[in-house]
Regions:
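P-loop NTPase motor module signature
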Residues: 1-287
Length: 287
């Protein structure tokens, strides 16, 4: 839409994503749709990797990359359009960017800013940007049935983890019995939980099933495996990287542990952050 509206000619169309894997995947997809090689007209930049071109039209990046650019380019003159995606995540970087670009618009009225999300309070965000217009884009809707499965009431972290892995295995086995179509996406809070759940499922000797991990620190080749379904049913154990921006093909069932590691201030006076283990947010669950 931005390209059709003539944006990207006087500067880049910059699109932020909350995670590196999402920035890379989005750049891959858009480059494929435009029929160009990644790194030419469409590129991306994440920490330690830059495949963007100043002569291109579209640049995907993490929100941290764009925030870092404000240090050397306070006017963000390289861009004529900025898209802040997944604004409902409300990370520190996203909050800073939303406040910064609002002030920047007063100095650069020709700059266009688009804030996107499936679950934000549109009225509040529109008011924040001076009663900006709200555009609703209808997506493909599918009926979703939510089933709650209580876990055991064990005490102690290790026993609670075992209850969780047993609950996942029970749910998978039940799904295998009632409906063998499609793959299963399982949301867990971190890498350790993913590897432990993978080991637990391996001991169950599930037939005709492939178990794949998905988290930000995986190599690009390992991450790409989830986008290429095979003949067997796949169980994809993922952190919240697959909640937004990424569309994993052939998913029919989702098992959500309801737990996540969320970045929080440990000592606000010193600016220290930690990844706190907590229940997931409502907006993330709705997404």
């Amino acid at each position: 839409m931005c390209l059709e509206a003539g944006r990207g000619l006087r500067g880049l169309i910059g699109c932020t994503q909350p995670r590196r894997i999402a920035a890379h995947a989005m750049a891959d997809r858009v480059a494929e749709e435009l029929g160009c090689e990644l790194g030419t007209l469409v590129g991306y930049q994440v920490r330690f990797r830059d495949r963007s071109s100043p002569d291109g039209y579209i640049k995907f990046m993490t929100d941290g990359i764009l925030l870092a650019e404000t240090v050397s380019d306070r006017e963000l003159a390289a861009y004529d359009t900025l898209i802040i995606d997944e604004a409902h995540e409300r990370s520190l970087n996203i909050d800073f960017l939303i406040g910064y670009v609002r002030q920047l618009l007063a100095r650069r009225p020709e700059l266009r800013v688009i804030v996107t999300s499936a679950t934000i309070d549109t009225e509040k965000f529109a008011a924040h940007f001076g009663n900006a217009p709200v555009i609703e884009v209808s997506g493909r809707g599918h009926p979703v049935e939510v089933i709650y499965q209580p876990l055991g009431e064990s005490t102690g972290a290790e026993r609670k983890d075992r209850d969780l892995y047993r609950g996942i295995a029970d749910a998978v086995q039940k799904l295998n019995r009632v409906d063998a179509r499609g793959d299963i996406l399982v949301f867990l809070s971190g890498e350790r939980e993913i590897h432990e759940a993978r080991d637990y499922l391996a001991r169950q000797k599930l037939r005709h099933t492939e178990v794949l991990p998905l988290y930000a620190r995986l190599s690009h080749a390992e991450q790409r495996r989830v986008f290429h379904p095979g003949p067997e049913r796949r169980i994809i154990l993922s952190t919240n990287v697959a909640e937004t921006s990424l569309t994993v093909p052939r998913i029919r069932f989702v098992i959500d542990s309801g737990l996540a590691r969320i970045s929080r201030f440990a000592r606000p006076s010193r600016g220290t952050e930690l990844l706190a283990y907590s229940q997931g947010r409502n907006a993330d669950g709705q997404q």
